[in-house]
Regions:
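Ubiquitin-like/PB1-type beta-grasp interaction modules and other compact soluble beta-rich domains
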Residues: 1-83
């Protein structure tokens, strides 16, 4: 099955080619996709572990099962502003 990966912030700068359609096995979960990205060293593990994931523009739990055509956004931690 194919899902659309969307990267933001530093992820887009580090791995612009990863912001594309991705082949996954049927029944893959958000956690499985993140594990795959860590194994492939596509994105920095420390930053990846601190990030949120949205599927079809809604925050997703690691157990969420992905389906054909889902849009998966990897959202890095946000910082900045004034105390």
């Amino acid at each position: 099955m194919r899902v659309r990966m969307r990267l933001f912030g530093p992820f887009k700068e580090i791995a612009p080619a990863a912001d594309a359609w991705r082949e996954l096995r049927e029944g893959e979960t958000v956690a499985g996709l993140l594990a795959l990205l860590r194994r492939e060293a596509v994105l920095p593990e420390k930053l990846l572990l601190a990030s949120a994931v949205a599927v079809n523009q809604e925050y997703a739990q690691p157990t969420r099962i992905l389906v054909e055509g889902d849009e998966v956004a990897i959202l890095p931690p946000v910082s900045g502003g004034r105390p």
